[in-house]
Amino acid sequence: MKTLLLTLVVVTIVCLDLGYTLKCNKLVPLFYKTCPAGKNLCYKIFMVATPKVPVKRGCIDVCPKNSALVKYVCCNTDRCN
């Protein structure tokens, strides 16, 4: 009986996500992905010429600097991009 209980506890721990995982939108916001460890920011990339149309979305570890052609927007809450 103790073995069965221990097995159930181990399976529960393995199946549950004990750590916080960030969820970021993919290019189409209806879909999202769970970010891997170490990637704790969501991002969205815009072309400066078309600032209302995102080119790419996802998970990232450090927010890159904007350039003359590309603007990055980063955030750190679920599906904020």
UniProtKB/Swiss-Prot annotation:
Keywords: Cardiotoxin, Cytolysis, Disulfide bond, Membrane, Secreted, Signal, Target cell membrane, Target membrane, Toxin. The keyword Ion transport does not apply. Gene3D superfamilies: CD59. Disulfide bonds join 24-42, 35-59, 63-74, 75-80. PROSITE patterns: SNAKE_TOXIN (PS00272). GO terms for molecular function: toxin activity. It comes from the Eukaryota. SUPFAM superfamilies: Snake toxin-like. Residues 1-21 form the signal peptide. InterPro entries: Cytotoxin_Cobra, Snake_3FTx, Snake_toxin-like_sf, Snake_toxin_con_site, Toxin_cobra-type. One of its GO terms (cellular component) is extracellular region. Expressed by the venom gland. One of its GO terms (biological process) is killing of cells of another organism. It is found in: Secreted; Target cell membrane. Shows cytolytic activity on many different cells by forming pore in lipid membranes. In vivo, increases heart rate or kills the animal by cardiac arrest. In addition, it binds to heparin with high affinity, interacts with Kv channel-interacting protein 1 (KCNIP1) in a calcium-independent manner, and binds to integrin alpha-V/beta-3 (ITGAV/ITGB3) with moderate affinity. Monomer in solution; Homodimer and oligomer in the presence of negatively charged lipids forming a pore with a size ranging between 20 and 30 Angstroms. Belongs to the three-finger toxin family. Short-chain subfamily. Type IA cytotoxin sub-subfamily. This is Cytotoxin 2. It comes from Naja kaouthia.
